[in-house]
């Protein structure tokens, strides 16, 4: 969206992506076959790539819980999870969970073979049944494994990629979006970044940097009421406690709210914030007294703002990367990409 001249605030990282967080990797498995009414996939995020399981400190929040993110009971109790995050469609959660579990057993082979260990992967979803035959159960365990094995630390493809392939945002083509910010706190530079699977909102709500874009572009709307969701993953290399990470996750509501969404009743608006700092062994192998760094909450506001800015921009990036796609249910309509020329002109005037 920055390429269109949209003046987003803040300083992005070199990739303006969640992979600006050092070491974090993202992969996709994108499934498209119009003859089979297939437009779906899997997005994989690996906060700590490698073959040794380590705790990833995290916090979770649901603005509106009409959706699923597995593993969050333990995140809420223990403040961490282990392994990757995957995002897919609503009916693909079970298959992806099976695939991620198999991948973890194989990747962390020594851990699973030599200890009483269990996998509780984080798998989240949004509904792609307008552009994809979701009841055909196209997503299978091997697609999750393929996305995980494709993960890299480079640029992140946006729009109709991975789990975002069949998603609609504010009745424009939506999907995967990402953005990042660099901030300085206490003389240290940190990265805060987001990845979203944007499938939420109705056209009249869409607001971009304060402009009522949805009301100015009402053509080809698809819905009479909101029926989508958004998954937000926020990542940072700042050392944060699990409590602070939950507070960061809550700020995702502000990020999507800037885009116009009130968090509709039928929307699963579910957020996870994680930190790659405080690298260490699994708790059962750690000493009784843990020593971790933790950013003082009195200095955290800049990080909150960076998270809000990253999420706001990620949603717009998902929309701007869209293309026209034929609907499956109901058939015969077209989910339009946003008119980038009109969007560019709007901000040139403003």
Positions of PLM-derived features:
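Alpha/propeptide regions of enzymes that mature by internal proteolysis
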Residues: 1-350
């Amino acid at each position: 969206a920055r390429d269109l001249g949209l003046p987003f605030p803040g300083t992005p990282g070199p990739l303006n992506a969640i992979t600006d967080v050092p070491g974090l990797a993202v992969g996709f498995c994108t499934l498209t076959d119009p003859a089979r009414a297939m437009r779906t996939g899997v997005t994989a995020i690996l906060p700590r790539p490698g073959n040794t399981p380590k705790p990833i400190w995290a916090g979770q929040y649901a603005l509106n819980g009409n959706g699923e993110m597995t593993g969050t009971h333990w995140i809420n109790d223990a403040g961490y999870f282990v392994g990757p995050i995957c995002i897919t469609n609503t009916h693909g959660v079970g298959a992806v969970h099976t695939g991620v579990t198999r991948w973890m057993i194989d990747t962390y082979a020594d851990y699973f073979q030599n200890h009483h260990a269990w996998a509780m992967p984080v798998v989240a979803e949004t509904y792609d049944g307008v552009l994809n035959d979701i009841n055909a159960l196209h997503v299978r365990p091997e697609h999750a494994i393929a996305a995980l094995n494709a993960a890299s630390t480079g640029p992140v493809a946006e729009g109709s990629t991975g789990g975002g392939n069949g998603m609609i945002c504010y009745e424009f083509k939506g999907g995967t979006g990402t953005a990042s910010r660099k901030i300085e706190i206490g003389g240290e530079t940190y990265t805060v970044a987001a990845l979203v699977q944007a499938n939420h909102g109705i056209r009249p709500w869409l607001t971009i940097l304060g402009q009522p874009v949805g009301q100015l572009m009402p053509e080809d709307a698809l819905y009479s009421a909101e029926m989508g969701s958004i998954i937000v993953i926020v990542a940072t290399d700042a050392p944060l406690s699990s409590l602070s990470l939950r507070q960061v996750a809550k700020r995702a509501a502000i990020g999507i709210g800037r885009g116009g969404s009130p968090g509709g009743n039928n929307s699963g608006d579910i957020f996870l914030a994680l930190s790659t700092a405080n690298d260490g062994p699994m708790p059962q192998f750690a000493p009784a007294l843990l020593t971790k760094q933790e950013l003082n909450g009195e200095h955290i506001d800049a990080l909150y703002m960076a998270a809000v800015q990253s999420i706001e921009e990620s949603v717009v990036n998902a929309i701007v990367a869209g293309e026209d796609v034929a609907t499956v249910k109901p058939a015969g309509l077209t989910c339009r990409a946003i008119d980038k020329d009109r969007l560019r002109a709007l901000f040139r005037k403003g």
